[in-house]
Regions:
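Membrane-interface extramembranous regions
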Residues: 1-142
Length: 142
């Protein structure tokens, strides 16, 4: 269980930090502005994506509802796949479009470890609930 927690926190920290940094770069870097033009995206999309990345990074590290967390993972997966497709479509070299796919793997590792933590937490709460029921059942039966 400790190994899963460490894996989850490290991988999730990497994703959250990378998304926060890239959002900052999207908002401040002229080089990133030029890259979005190169990819054929309008300027406002860069800003929307930066805001979405900041919100998503917060949702990954904050204690939010499981559905919110899962939608955040789905959104980031779409971002990484779309980034790879955009770079491939514009003829960028493999070194450019491989990076989002590597982060997709890191995201997948974070998601799998998150699911394992959720299932172990669920099992613990059911075991505690189950023992409470049996004690109640025993007291009623007596």
């Amino acid at each position: 269980m400790k190994k899963i927690k460490i894996t989850y926190y490290v991988l999730t920290g990497i994703i959250a930090a990378m998304m926060t940094y890239s959002a900052y770069a999207y908002l401040t870097s002229d080089q990133v502005k030029q890259a979005f033009v190169h990819l054929g995206f309008p300027g406002y999309f860069r800003i929307e994506l930066a805001v979405a990345k900041l919100i998503g990074a917060a949702m990954l590290v904050l204690p939010v509802a499981q559905k919110v967390k899962e939608w955040t993972y789905a959104g980031f997966a779409i971002v990484f796949v779309s980034a790879a497709v955009a770079h491939i479509s514009s003829g960028d070299p493999a070194s450019v479009f491989i990076a989002p796919l590597i982060f997709l793997l890191v995201l997948a590792g974070s998601y799998v470890s998150y699911q394992k933590l959720q299932s172990s937490t669920f099992e613990k709460s059911n075991n505690n609930l189950g023992s409470g029921r049996s004690a109640l059942s025993e007291s009623i039966a007596a």
